[in-house]
């Protein structure tokens, strides 16, 4: 009997250790330091501090439905009803969204860049890869429409987790924008985790994912199965441009292809030749901008 208890205790200890480790890695993924992001963007020529400081803008605070504040910056150099919201990727912050905002400023849009929960200056205790973030995005959309009018022309651009968040918002809550640009989204979080685990430790994800999911449900009150953009993409009617690098080895381009294939209505697809994950714009600037221009011309602007 004592041996049985020791065995059961060892199994329980193993499961608990795996569960805590996996859920911690997901909930508290190490974020990039803001100084690192600023210096990276400056050195690459994607951030000009002087030009940015000279923009007409204001810092805003928008309450999340989960009790923390979302920190955002509203940039309004133009007297226009055209706005775009930029949704950044995991471990990044709104500084990394400036390059995308500039792309739209050059096309006559005003913009909002903001920090996801637990990123940048926003509150929030953990990261949920789109599950809670989609409700925060709705708060940003609601605030903008309340302040600027429901008749605005609104676009949302998302990168990586930010793109997945955008799809979960548009397909799972409300199709609240006039157009969307999804840059390197994952189609299903469980499928992504399975791939990443196999790449990192050469073991099938089915060993670890159920344990991680059990602990996520207990600690963060969400389930991995609920983070599945592919389950919601067909509910989005507004036009969407899908972008992905062919050489992305973190979120495979096949995931974007699946999303594109299932999306109904107006849509376009652009596969960038150069760059790895979330580098399509950085490594293919002219082609990226042309893809955006072609999309806007065909589906958004007459």
Language-model features: locations:
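Catalytic histidine-centered segment of alpha/beta-hydrolase-like enzymes
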Residues: 275-289
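Short alpha-helix in the alpha/beta-hydrolase fold that links the catalytic acid
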Residues: 229, 238, 252-261
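An N-terminal hydrophobic leader/cap segment in hydrolases
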Residues: 4-63
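Conserved alpha/beta-hydrolase
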Residues: 101-123
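Hydrolase active-site cap/lid region
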Residues: 168-222
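The serine-hydrolase catalytic nucleophile loop
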Residues: 90-103
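Alpha/beta-hydrolase active-site loop
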Residues: 127-148
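Short beta-strand/loop motif that positions the catalytic acidic residue
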Residues: 235-237, 242-244, 248
